């Protein structure tokens, strides 16, 4: 399966260039989204979705990001469960998961 990433970041062009640079070096296709779909997300939205990657390949990609000082809190691998979710739903789920992992879950 071809490796692809979807990286959304509306505010930090340097991070976008860094993530895209890693993808290009690793021969990973960079997916684009429409402005219409991007507009369904909050202005501060940032997320990274890995498609067609093994766990080890994701780990290697994240190591490259770490070397460049790039941190993305909301990230996931595409699964059968989430592959058809809209970006809005994916972002919401990742926000909830991130809050849970940080111990900020709602009672």
Put a short name on every predicted segment.
Residues 1-4, 41-46, 71:
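Glycine-rich, often proline-containing surface loops adjacent to acidic residues and nearby aromatics
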Residues 11-19, 39-43, 73:
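Generic detector of short, locally flexible boundary/turn motifs and exposed helical patches
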Residues 14-15, 58-104:
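Helix-rich interaction surfaces within compact, conserved domain-sized segments
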Residues 29-60:
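Short, intrinsically disordered low-complexity segments
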